[in-house]
């Protein structure tokens, strides 16, 4: 029984090491209270395993390290799974909205790379997408752009999912 427990904890630690995290922004924010201003830090963090799972998290704490840790935990709570094609791209063109930000993504040929800016680039890289074209419109806010990218990626569907929804075999999908 003790060995069972030991092996479970080792496996959990092994899974932990596969996650990568990148800090998009650290901002010092203040709250006005009776005694003056109370300073704290807000960290926006993207967490992904580069194999189709990614999440965006926000953490606030009185120190930077605490804010980043909370952001990583929040990102792991809000993970999404995305389908990635054999050419390490997305299956079809999509767009997503988060706040005032709009993100447009299109699949790209192998060797193109990730052509995107700012927070959207970070989200796509940590999701494991290697060939994609993306454009962010409407806002330069990193949090809204990251959330718009995650919203867009969450709407991706594979050919088999589309065929199943329509109730037809995959061979008859484009006939």
Curated annotation (Swiss-Prot):
Annotated ranges, domain S5 DRBM: 19-82
Signal peptide: none
Keyword Zinc: no
GO MF term list: rRNA binding; structural constituent of ribosome
PROSITE patterns on file: RIBOSOMAL_S5 (PS00585), S5_DSRBD (PS50881)
Keywords for the protein's UniProt record, in alphabetical order: Ribonucleoprotein, Ribosomal protein, RNA-binding, rRNA-binding
Top-level taxonomic group: Bacteria
Keyword Transcription: no
InterPro entries in alphabetical order: Ribosomal_Su5_D2-typ_SF, Ribosomal_uS5, Ribosomal_uS5_bac-type, Ribosomal_uS5_C, Ribosomal_uS5_N, Ribosomal_uS5_N_CS, Ribsml_uS5_D2-typ_fold_subgr
One example of a Gene Ontology biological process annotation: translation
One Gene Ontology cellular component annotation held by this UniProt entry: small ribosomal subunit
Stated family: Belongs to the universal ribosomal protein uS5 family.
Domain commentary: The N-terminal domain interacts with the head of the 30S subunit; the C-terminal domain interacts with the body and contacts protein S4. The interaction surface between S4 and S5 is involved in control of translational fidelity.
HAMAP family (UniProt xref): Ribosomal_uS5_B (MF_01307_B)
Subunit structure: Part of the 30S ribosomal subunit. Contacts proteins S4 and S8.
Role summary: With S4 and S12 plays an important role in translational accuracy.
Name of the molecule in the record: Small ribosomal subunit protein uS5
Native organism: Nostoc punctiforme (strain ATCC 29133 / PCC 73102)
Gene: rpsE
């Amino acid at each position: 029984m003790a060995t069972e427990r030991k092996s479970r904890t080792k496996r959990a630690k092994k899974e932990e090491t596969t996650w990568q995290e990148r800090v998009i922004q650290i901002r010092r924010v203040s709250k006005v209270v009776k005694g003056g201003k109370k300073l704290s830090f807000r960290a926006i963090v993207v967490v992904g395993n580069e194999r189709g799972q990614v999440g965006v998290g926000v953490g606030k704490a009185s120190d930077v390290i605490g804010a980043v840790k909370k952001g990583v935990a929040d990102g792991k709570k809000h993970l999404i799974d995305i389908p990635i094609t054999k050419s390490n791209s997305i299956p079809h063109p999509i767009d997503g909205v988060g706040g005032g930000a709009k993100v447009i993504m299109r699949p790209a040929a192998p060797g193109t790379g990730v052509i995107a800016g700012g927070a959207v680039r970070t989200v796509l890289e940590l999701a494991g997408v290697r060939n994609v074209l993306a454009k962010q419109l409407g806002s330069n806010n990193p949090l809204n752009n990251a959330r718009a990218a995650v919203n867009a990626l969450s709407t991706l569907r594979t050919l088999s999912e589309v065929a199943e929804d329509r109730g037809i075999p995959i061979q008859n999908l484009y006939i």
